[in-house]
Amino acid sequence: RQRQMCIRDRAYIMKMNEDPTALDKALEDINLYAANLFSAGFKSMTEASIIKWATETYPDYSELYVGKTSVSSPQTLNPKKKLHAAPYNTLEEGGPQESMLQALIFMRRYQFLHEGMRWFDTRRFGITVYRYLLDEDAETVVQITDQISDENGTADPRRALQLPADVIAAGLTPNPRK
């Protein structure tokens, strides 16, 4: 049920410019979703609180995690991700739509942490995935060994799920790999 709500909520967010009631519907869903996801001390979110969260910078955000980024990392740990896939890449950064979408993506990232569902979000929104080499204590990033990105406007073929072996054996062309 929560997965269906996320899909519906994303649709409401993308229709905010066309439908004046979409904002209220999206906020209602986000609050219901968040109340079920975060039980301790949950406070109802408003459009203003979501925009404030999405436009603030979080210099100490990486301290919340075991791993830490290094000076050679192109990014610091941040709850917001750059969206490269259309139509999400055309949203005004820090605007109501982009802010609410970032909040929804953050909640989905939290909910689906160990379920493998994040891969579909990284593909859908064109979020860059970095692969890191960590030091001996597994806390500090030594270097980035690879990244899967749609930044240049072309979808990275490694994001596509490969077809099953029996389907390929039957003659269907497999999805390309890099």
Residue ranges, per PLM feature:
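Acidic/polar-rich alpha-helix caps and helix-coil junctions
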Residues: 1-4, 8-178
